[in-house]
UniProtKB/Swiss-Prot annotation:
Keyword annotations: Hydrolase, Metal-binding, Metalloprotease, Protease, Zinc
GO-annotated biological processes: proteolysis
NCBIfam families reported for this sequence: PRK00024.1, radc
Residues involved in Zn(2+) binding: H181, H183, D194
CDD domains: MPN_DUF2466
Motif placement: JAMM motif: 181-194
Example GO molecular function: metallopeptidase activity
Organism taxonomic ancestry: Bacteria, Pseudomonadati, Rhodothermota, Rhodothermia, Rhodothermales
Stretches assigned to the MPN domain: 110-232
Organism: Salinibacter ruber (strain DSM 13855 / M31)
Protein's name according to its UniProt entry: UPF0758 protein SRU_2338
Family: Belongs to the UPF0758 family.
Superkingdom of origin: Bacteria
Amino acid sequence: MYRVPIHEWDESDQPREKLLTHGPTVLSDAEVLALLLGSGTRTSDGPVSAVELGRALLQSYGSLHEVSQRKPKELTRTRGVGPAKATKLAAAFEAGRRVESQRQQDERMQVTCPADVADVYGPLLRDLDKEVFKVVHLNTANVIIGDYTVSEGGLSSSVVEPRGVFEQAILDDAAAVICLHNHPSGNPEPSREDIRITRQLAEAGGTMGIPVHDHLIIAGTKHTSLAERGVID
């Protein structure tokens, strides 16, 4: 069966022309993926357009969101998607996550509840395959003024210690901090080590005059507040 290449389609049907003429919101999910992929490919059955590759990815994973959660190696399981195309997609989705997180940070958001912090940092942490421990710095009005990554790859008292948590907070003149880390397993329940470290940091913060308002665990789209659990007084 002969497949008509995209460049031979009617201009009004070509994803690039549709975007330039009508804007990105008119594009289907398959067309958005096609523009990110950049081009189609050739298989033993003949040429496959970028839009067809986009449809194949959506069929494989069910939705654009699910495609965005996949690692490059997983994306290459779809026929016609090689490492180059897979890394393009992964980079584009990561850019989107960073833009959303930075947009909320740029608004100098005031923290009124744990969900506020989860909304800002969840997109950056929830899809990682290793644990990352971050500290969010707040001013006296509970507005986010900065953040600092303390450790990557695991959570233990030898990696997360008070000095590493509060040193940068002092330099930023933070009035308080909120700690957070992710659980790649997707389980938002705190471990014994999570609770122990939280109490250790809260005690150190009280001594230094930089209180720890909360410690959030990000797990997928869920989060747990250890302050709400009563771990932090």
